Amino acid sequence: MKVFVHGWQHKISHTRILYSLRRFYHVETPFNQNIVSGRDLESTGFAWWSGNARLINVSGKLLGAHVAHAGIMVFWTGAMTLFEVAHFIPEKPLYEQGFILIPHLATLGWGVGPGGEIINIYPYFVVGILHLISSAVLGFGGLYHALIGPDTLEESFPFFGYDWRDKNKMTTILGIHLVLLGIGSFLLVIKALFFGGVYDTWAPGGGDVRLINNPTLNPAIIFGYVLKSPFGGDGWIVSVNNMEDLIGGHVWIGVVCIAGGIWHILTKPFAWARRAFVWSGEAYLSYSLGALSLMGLTASNYVWYNNTAYPSEFYGPTGPEASQAQAFTFLVRDQRLGANVASAQGPTGLGKYLMRSPSGEIIFGGETMRFWDLRAPWVEPLRGANGLDLNKIKNDIQPWQERRAAEYMTHAPLGSLNSVGGVATEINSVNYVSPRSWLTTSHFFLGFFLFIGHLWHAGRARAAAAGFEKGINRENEAVLSMRPLD
């Protein structure tokens, strides 16, 4: 049924202008302006699917959207943590159960015993409940600011109000964010130094929770990671391999963030910065997306390669670690059967169990030689001044090393391994889904699409600042050339 009322004539005319003469309409239900004031197409220029773009000039409602979004994220975290707690099986390692949140909590030293054994899941339950309670508070705050609170904050709460073009206010907000990030960094430092410590996979005997009493504060060491090459055995910041450096790095990050935050709060942007940057809401969005993209892509590499910040006891072995574990497992087996592992040759004439690396070190032989520079807690005790120590290989291998290598051998992050030494012969899900693979892939794709979003919004912001037409010309939208649905 078509409805036409003379009182709606101005709305219909406006719709024709905004969309197309070929648009159709059955019954139009006008928005309740008391509820969605400043968030409809007529008042903002953005349709509902443009999301927060409708709230560019209504700071109070934009605050509500952000607080509600935080509530959603915290709710997922709490609910998913409780889901993992409910499905926890003590007899199986975390990485075999597909968990991605409990491993993070275990890394912080909660509920963990020697060797990475989970001895108490109650702390994880508490963390999940606290996140659910927090999400309820955030959800209420989001609804309040979205529906009841003032449209803009400038009149009611000047401290929280802002103008996107106010460069001094924007850098002050940046400074506040940096201070909060610095405080967050110091929370980890405080936990590691004073409140129970953190899990250290390098602790003697196969890993344990310990206090980090002497974090590395030498700037040459900490910033040396940043200046390292990201290629080969250098590994940039991903190459950190001890908890002292990791916690010391957080000390420096906290200091730099807080100092930078105070600087931005107390100062105004220099003239060159005023000229170089675009100062608009969409520009700030693009900067944020670019920063998040860098974080996501860095985290992707960190999860995949680093077994210090992401212990293999919780996340499963790295690819090189699983390959080396297989070579080690077969070496132990054949040595017990009487094989001379120091001199045995494989079918290619190279060492079957042990061989020389390009730099002359003794390494595991076979196809796993490509991962000769792997460092892992279960194999490091067997090294000497020139690589693997033959005397230790023959006399000092401990049962926990054998068990861990055998477990890692069958849980490679890329899938099942064959007996050659490290080649993935089955897709990941045939054997099991590695949390290390899952987190690596998810962070890579999130980082990638955040980078695309950065380019998109940066282009729009620069075009708007230069006075170009921004967005798609609505006259050329594909949908306008299609037949009406009825």
Swiss-Prot record:
Keyword annotations from UniProtKB, A to Z: Chlorophyll, Chloroplast, Chromophore, Manganese, Membrane, Metal-binding, Photosynthesis, Photosystem II, Plastid, Thylakoid, Transmembrane, Transmembrane helix
Membrane-crossing residues? 82-106, 147-168, 191-213, 268-288, 304-325, 460-484
Name a biological process GO annotation.
photosynthetic electron transport in photosystem II
Pfam families hit by this protein? PSII
Which Gene Ontology cellular component terms are annotated? chloroplast thylakoid membrane; photosystem II
- Binding of [CaMn4O5] cluster occurs at E380
Lineage top rank: taxon: Eukaryota
Could you cite one Gene Ontology molecular function of this protein? metal ion binding
Per the UniProt entry, the propeptide covers 1-28
Specify the signal sequence span: none
Membrane topology (UniProt): Multi-pass membrane protein
- Compartments it resides in: Plastid, Chloroplast thylakoid membrane
Q: Where this protein primarily resides, as one coarse class?
A: plastid
Keyword Flavoprotein annotated? no
Cofactor stoichiometry and binding remark: Binds multiple chlorophylls and provides some of the ligands for the Ca-4Mn-5O cluster of the oxygen-evolving complex. It may also provide a ligand for a Cl- that is required for oxygen evolution. PSII binds additional chlorophylls, carotenoids and specific lipids.
Function (record text): One of the components of the core complex of photosystem II (PSII). It binds chlorophyll and helps catalyze the primary light-induced photochemical processes of PSII. PSII is a light-driven water:plastoquinone oxidoreductase, using light energy to abstract electrons from H(2)O, generating O(2) and a proton gradient subsequently used for ATP formation.
What is the similarity comment for this entry? Belongs to the PsbB/PsbC family. PsbC subfamily.
Protein name in the entry: Photosystem II CP43 reaction center protein
